[in-house]
């Protein structure tokens, strides 16, 4: 079976990670003790992708939980599904990273990373045929961003041919914990561009807007934001966890979604949007789902897809519905909005359907878009980064941990390069391909 090893790092990573396991355990009929109480063979058919089967028929998440302080881990352990995790897979330090990327990446995190790798190795060894890794983390803090990216690069060294997938929560001024978030995020993106195969950009600003505007929650809590994240994560992993044809493993998803290796930052979306604990009163129709799913208001990254063009799209529909209708609606969207899809990648929209809907919904749709509009998100961080870096504000926290200003400059220019690459493909048309190729080859050699 094609297994995935899940890792969660830092406070944010552990909170959304724990929520992810709650949601998918529920979908697969697994209770907090790891016992199966489901009612459908489909729930067990690919259970091995995320769970190990232990003695006595218990299912244990193939998850490694990492943090530089014990606090969040303790709350995961005492949370609703805290007892389902393997106790040895909790790896934590005592010092904390203090929202400092350098502490997570170079000092505190570097001391802990070997013991994390031991646990990861143990999980990987118990796999029959490991397909890859997924990490949940945030880019704004110290541990998830600094140590998370260190972990990725170490795993990349040891398992160079396995897929590396991240769910990365991008900071935003609206929901901000620390003033140095732009530094931490830029240093992290610098790593993600080089070392991951697929990164889902989940953006607190977009989540906040969805809670506020669509769900009419006046003061959204992290719990409300995480509810949206877990719905989205459950959606994008559906194809990996349930039997199906399309994007059934991480590599196939990457092949369909990533036209150029550096441009692997996806914008997830979800429909219908529901708030925590609410029930849906009527099932949506397939046209409504499709329309909502492509709506800018449903995107989990604060970028407007209408400001860019889609390179590739994957859609996952869940529930009992007519495949024919789904295909018709998806074609309909593409035909009506053809200017928003690049014409030099034909058939760049792929659709999968899974019979099992998420809890509390009759049908749902999850959206994964590789859009050039994601550059807005990187521009936003880059502007904040530059504003502080120009004045060398807060730099001593980083240089004090042994970092060099040079590294900041490199990260800044790598992020700006990423923005211009997206822009280049946004402007590209099928006709001008000739002159385009020569440039490309020149670039490749330079890189």
Swiss-Prot record:
Residues 429-447 have a biased composition (Acidic residues). Residues 420-447 are annotated as: Disordered. It is found in: Cytoplasm, Cytoskeleton. PROSITE patterns: TUBULIN (PS00227), TUBULIN_B_AUTOREG (PS00228). Keywords: Cytoplasm, Cytoskeleton, GTP-binding, Magnesium, Metal-binding, Microtubule, Nucleotide-binding. It comes from the Eukaryota. One of its GO terms (cellular component) is cytoplasm. GO terms for biological process: microtubule-based process. Mg(2+) binds at residue 69. One of its GO terms (molecular function) is metal ion binding. GTP binds at residues 11, 69, 138, 142-144, 204, 226. Tubulin is the major constituent of microtubules, a cylinder consisting of laterally associated linear protofilaments composed of alpha- and beta-tubulin heterodimers. Microtubules grow by the addition of GTP-tubulin dimers to the microtubule end, where a stabilizing cap forms. Below the cap, tubulin dimers are in GDP-bound state, owing to GTPase activity of alpha-tubulin. Dimer of alpha and beta chains. A typical microtubule is a hollow water-filled tube with an outer diameter of 25 nm and an inner diameter of 15 nM. Alpha-beta heterodimers associate head-to-tail to form protofilaments running lengthwise along the microtubule wall with the beta-tubulin subunit facing the microtubule plus end conferring a structural polarity. Microtubules usually have 13 protofilaments but different protofilament numbers can be found in some organisms and specialized cells. PANTHER family: TUBULIN (PTHR11588). Belongs to the tubulin family. This is Tubulin beta chain. It comes from Paracentrotus lividus.
């Amino acid at each position: 079976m094609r297994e995935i090893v899940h890792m969660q790092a830092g406070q944010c990573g552990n909170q959304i990670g724990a929520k992810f396991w709650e949601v998918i355990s529920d979908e697969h009929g697994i209770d907090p003790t790891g016992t199966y109480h489901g009612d459908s063979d489909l729930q067990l058919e690919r259970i091995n992708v995320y769970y190990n089967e232990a003695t006595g028929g218990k299912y244990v998440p193939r998850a490694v939980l990492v943090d530089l302080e014990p606090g969040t881990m303790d709350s995961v352990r005492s949370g609703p599904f805290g007892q389902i995790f393997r106790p040895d897979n909790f790896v934590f330090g005592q010092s904390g990273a203090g929202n400092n990327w350098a502490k997570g990446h170079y000092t505190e995190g570097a001391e802990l990373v070997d013991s994390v790798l031991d646990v990861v190795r143990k999980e990987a060894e118990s796999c029959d045929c490991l397909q890859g890794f997924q990490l949940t983390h945030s880019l704004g803090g110290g541990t998830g961003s600094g140590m998370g990216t260190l972990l990725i690069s170490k795993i990349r060294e040891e398992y160079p041919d396995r897929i590396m997938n991240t769910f990365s929560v991008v900071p935003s001024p609206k929901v901000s914990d620390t003033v140095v978030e732009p530094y931490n995020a830029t240093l992290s993106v610098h790593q993600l561009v080089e070392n991951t195969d697929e990164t889902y950009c989940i953006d607190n600003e977009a989540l906040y807007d969805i809670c506020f505007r669509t769900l009419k929650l006046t003061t959204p809590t992290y719990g409300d934001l995480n509810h949206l994240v877990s719905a989205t994560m459950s959606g994008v992993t559906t194809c990996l966890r349930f039997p199906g044809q399309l994007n059934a493993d991480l590599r196939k998803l990457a092949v369909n979604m990533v036209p150029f290796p550096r441009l692997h930052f996806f914008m997830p979306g979800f429909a219908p949007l529901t708030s925590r604990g609410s029930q849906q009163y009527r099932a949506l129709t397939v046209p409504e789902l499709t329309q909502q799913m492509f709506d800018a208001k449903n995107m989990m990254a604060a970028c407007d897809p209408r400001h860019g063009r889609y390179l590739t799209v994957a859609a996952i529909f869940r529930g009992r519905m007519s495949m024919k209708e789904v295909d018709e609606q998806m074609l309909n969207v593409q035909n009506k909005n053809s200017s928003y899809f690049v014409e030099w990648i034909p058939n760049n929209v792929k659709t999968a359907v899974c019979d099992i809907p998420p809890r509390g919904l009759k049908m749902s749709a999850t959206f994964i878009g590789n859009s050039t509009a994601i550059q807005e998100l990187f521009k936003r961080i880059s502007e904040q980064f530059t504003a502080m870096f120009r004045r060398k504000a807060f730099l001593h926290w980083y240089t004090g941990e042994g970092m060099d200003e040079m590294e900041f400059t490199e990260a800044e220019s790598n992020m700006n390069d990423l923005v211009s690459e997206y822009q280049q493909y946004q402007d590209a048309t099928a006709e001008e391909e000739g002159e385009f190729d020569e440039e490309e080859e020149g670039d490749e050699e330079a890189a």
